[in-house]
Amino acid sequence: MLLAIDVGNTNTTLGVYDGAVLRRHWRVETSHTRTYDEYGILLRQLFASAGLEPARVSAVVIASVVPPLAFTLEQMCVRYFDRKPMFVGPGMKTGMPILYENPREVGADRVVNAVAAYERWRCALVVVDFGTATTFDVISAKGEYLGGAICPGIGISMDALARSASKLPRVEFAKPPSVVGKNTVASIQAGLVYGYVGMVDGICAQIAAELATPPKVVATGGLAPLIAGVSRSITEVDEHLTLEGLRILHERNR
């Protein structure tokens, strides 16, 4: 089995693959203060709850945008799974030309998403990932990574609003009954949901105008289904796109 780990600034997503089949997946908080023992015990508990045997893990692949956690995660893998992990980074065989001014600047998660999306759809694409930051990654019809856009994430916007406007509460990110809110909570939700949908659709329209081929827009991340349900541009949702990309890159670099 393959253990795939996607370390984001806010959450870490873990998946266990048996061949090409995603057997189980979990989302946990990314913590800078956990020791490798604490991460190891947490994963052992998750495996036990799913009836999975840690000894069956034959390889580990990690994409991380949190460099300080690299040593901790490596030690966790060695001590609790007896496996040295493969980290996504420069020099890895991606099968995708990275047409960025400095390819080393492209986050591991963005490369992984691009590889997974092109492997599945084989066309011009925009991948929108709703994480701590909302990222837009553009892939040409020939399978080249062209670049993209980075925006503040939904959670960051919610936190900033609640912190900076003392009379406005932090609300659940949920679709309101109408874009015209009838109370404070619904008004904030309308601004967040429809504001982000407007941003996504607007950026995707601008990207499409610059490309020779109209792109398919794919969304991933925990909030992708909600946004996609309102967006006019998003046509596909794959919440496990990053994990699938990790599996593909592991296969290409074994």
UniProtKB/Swiss-Prot annotation:
Its EC number is 2.7.1.33. Keywords: ATP-binding, Coenzyme A biosynthesis, Cytoplasm, Kinase, Metal-binding, Nucleotide-binding, Potassium, Transferase. K(+) binds at residue 129. One of its GO terms (molecular function) is metal ion binding. Pfam families: Pan_kinase. The active site is at residue 109. GO terms for cellular component: cytoplasm. A monovalent cation. Ammonium or potassium. Substrate binds at residues 100, 107-110, 184. It comes from the Bacteria. The keyword Endoplasmic reticulum does not apply. It catalyses: (R)-pantothenate + ATP = (R)-4'-phosphopantothenate + ADP + H(+). ATP binds at residues 6-13, 132. Its cofactor is NH4(+); K(+). The keyword ATP-binding applies. Pathway: Cofactor biosynthesis; coenzyme A biosynthesis; CoA from (R)-pantothenate: step 1/5. It is found in: Cytoplasm. Homodimer. Catalyzes the phosphorylation of pantothenate (Pan), the first step in CoA biosynthesis. This is Type III pantothenate kinase. It comes from Anaeromyxobacter sp. (strain K). The gene is coaX.
